[in-house]
Amino acid sequence: MDDSDYLRLLTIAAEQANAFLSNARKWERERWVCQRLLQGLNIPYRADEFAPAGEPPDVLFRDANFEVFFVLDEGRRLNDEWRDELQRRRSAFSLSQLVRREAKPKRILANEFLLRLAQTLRKKAHNYTERGMDLGELDIIAFASLKREVLDL
């Protein structure tokens, strides 16, 4: 495989990431998060055990009513960076044009992260309560994808 073949594969991967992060594939993305959680907990599952639900919950699985939300670095939006990365890869003529240095992530304490998460959960709880939803019926999953910060455990 030469550089141009690899560059083409990188571009295809960015196209796939953009498609996966699109609104059209929201449920598929939320189901993927649930599957990653179940794998991490070593809980076996079959694809046919997942079903879309009304909003909320996002995903039904057995007796669980999963409500999924994403936790990103401040200022990051779910698909923006992949949209930009796709343009970067499409306009590159060589792999060397794709090389860039990333800033070293800042270490944050778990308590700091949990406080941030709690603030988001309070807002969500308020919104769900206003809509007449029973919070005890939801199984919340927070999927954290941090680039600028890393947990100091």
Would you name each region that the model predicts?
Residues 59, 64-70:
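Conserved catalytic cores of phosphodiester-cleaving nucleases, focusing on short active-site segments
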